[in-house]
Amino acid sequence: QRPAPATGFPTRTAQADLEFVLHAGHGEFARAVYTPGTIEEAFYVTIKAFNIAEKYQIPVFIMTDQHLADSYRNIETFDLDKGKVQRYIISKDDSKNTKNYKRYQFTESGISPRAIPSWIEDVIYADSDEHTEEGHITEDADIGRKMVEKRFYKKFSGISQEIERPTAYKLGGADVVLLGFGSTYGVMKEVCDVADDRKIGFIHLSQVWPFPASEM
């Protein structure tokens, strides 16, 4: 992210791309948007982002900026066991027993089984037009409604159960509470620490979509 319009300040920091990332697209679809504020968050959130993208088969965005990219400091060694990326693909052994494979199968979670071409005997069809469960083009209104429900409402519900909790700092007795996301973490924390005459706290969001309303 950088100040705009056009190329703007390509080596400076801004957060003006948020609305674009939240809403741009052809029609509605589920997505997740992460906004890490520290080096540690950037590392662990990236692992989480890959897992959410693989599990729900959706686009996931990590919004950073020059300030975070250029920052450096001493940190604790990353815990590599804290998060590992899972692929959520039908295993090669299970693929051998898969018959009548439906790439866009209707499920309770909205997540369709994902197979690797050549691992199963069936042909895998994928289409960018509205499609049937098998992947063939369709203009059937009922199927279209079910597909929207599958890939948006059901997936959104699942993603909402795996939200990153906001970071709260000095909220007890605070007269002013700052709210921010991304690299504003550092400046908000410093303001709270140096404010001698006012009680100031902050809430930092490392995930802005789905919005963590239940955690606020």
What are these regions (language model features)?
Residues 27-32, 170-171:
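Glycine/charged-rich beta-loop-alpha catalytic/anionic-binding loops adjacent to active sites
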Residues 45, 50-216:
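Flexible, low-complexity linker and terminal segments
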Residues 3-8, 33-35, 148-152, 198-200:
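N-terminal start-of-chain detector that recognizes signal peptides
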Residues 1-28:
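Flexible glycine/proline-rich, aromatic-decorated loop/lid segments
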